[in-house]
Amino acid sequence: MAFSCFDKFSYTYCYQCMHGPDGCMVPSRNGEGTELYAHSEELEAKLRELARRGHMEIEKELALEKKTYGSHIKILILGGPLSGKSTIFKQMQIIHVDGFKTDQELIQYRGLIDNNIRDIYLQLIAGSRVVGIPLDPIEHITYEIDEIYAPMSDAFSVRTISELLEPLTEFWNSKQIQEIYKRRCEFELLDSTKYYLENLTRIADPTYLPNQEDIVHSRKATMSINSIVFEYTGVSLLMIDVGGQRSERKKWLHLFDDAKVVLFVIDLTGYAKRSEESRMELSRFPKFFRDVGSNAYDMKVALKIFNEVAAASALANAVFLLFFNKVDLFKEILSQVNLQPCFSKFDGENTYEETSKYICEKFIRAASSKKSVFPHFTTATNTENVKLVFRACMESVFKANAKATGLS
């Protein structure tokens, strides 16, 4: 079956724990019950039946998919916690497919952005307690905001953000919140905080519908495996985002043994953040507090994941693309947080040039010398930057494939 760059492919897989609470995406502790189903109305009945079968049946189903889409170059997106995997995926939809343009999509993302802004507010409030900056001087503002937010449910149907424009703007511009924001690495805070709060006047307009940049900045925990097909320079690519599949990778990674490319995304600011990967994106709401004392640095977690993925026999023949993401935020944080606490052997200057080089070398060394690894630095929220970096990546992939097949 042939696809062109004008075809929109939205066949979505999801691996779900059959033992966890309320449809939790965390695999069960005894390692049993990982089932496969597809979010598609047409296939719902078929895949309900599939969910009752075992792993052998699942693999047979995937084998059929491989035959159907065997002509595509399969690109698997993996990475560390909150690294921007889904942002890259959205950019591919914008650049190479048809983006997000339907009324239904725009209204859904508008609701998500409203929720993101509420989460940002709550995270900043929680952050004040973490960093020890009291909010007494702006208590009247937070009281007004709380009064408006209090009746809201998760899926509020009536937009009230226009009522919040004035108090939220005053809240964001306050001395206390700006000081808390400077110390954002010490607590959980959405990367889109500054972007959304500085665009609040536009977003709060009653006629507002998000543009593509607004959508790229939006944040929603990825609980499923999403895929798109698009053409690039005459070659058909199948890109798969495995963002929500956190634990026990060895149990599902072999299902993608025909992937030609692994696009591994790393959050450069992760050197300054501590987290626990297994709980990072699996809770209903963002985690407002970080337990700094007991968790590893995000970047150390990402390095461990990359080492595991690079050593996986299922991906032995894949080309690895390293996307060192959030360059813009990384440069900001470098002036406040040194690299050495995360990497004790780093003895260079805390400049962008020296720190980025050191981090890049750490990841390259984590892969076998026989691996084809191509590092790239990017800002995933910048569409033009992603477009240029992806072009450079695919040139590397095509050259590596030509070399492997003796065509170069």
Curated annotation (Swiss-Prot):
Residues 214-222 are annotated as: G2 motif. SUPFAM superfamilies: P-loop containing nucleoside triphosphate hydrolases (SSF52540), Transducin (alpha subunit), insertion domain (SSF47895). Residues 74-87 are annotated as: G1 motif. One of its GO terms (molecular function) is GTP binding. Residues 378-383 are annotated as: G5 motif. PROSITE patterns: G_ALPHA. It holds the Pfam family G-alpha. The keyword Nucleotide-binding applies. Guanine nucleotide-binding proteins (G proteins) are involved as modulators or transducers in various transmembrane signaling systems. In association with the G-protein coupled dopamine receptor dop-2, modulates two types of learning: touch habituation and chemosensory associative conditioning. G proteins are composed of 3 units; alpha, beta and gamma. The alpha chain contains the guanine nucleotide binding site. Interacts with the dopamine receptor dop-2 (via C-terminus); the interaction is direct. This is Guanine nucleotide-binding protein alpha-14 subunit. The lineage of its organism: Eukaryota, Metazoa, Ecdysozoa, Nematoda, Chromadorea.
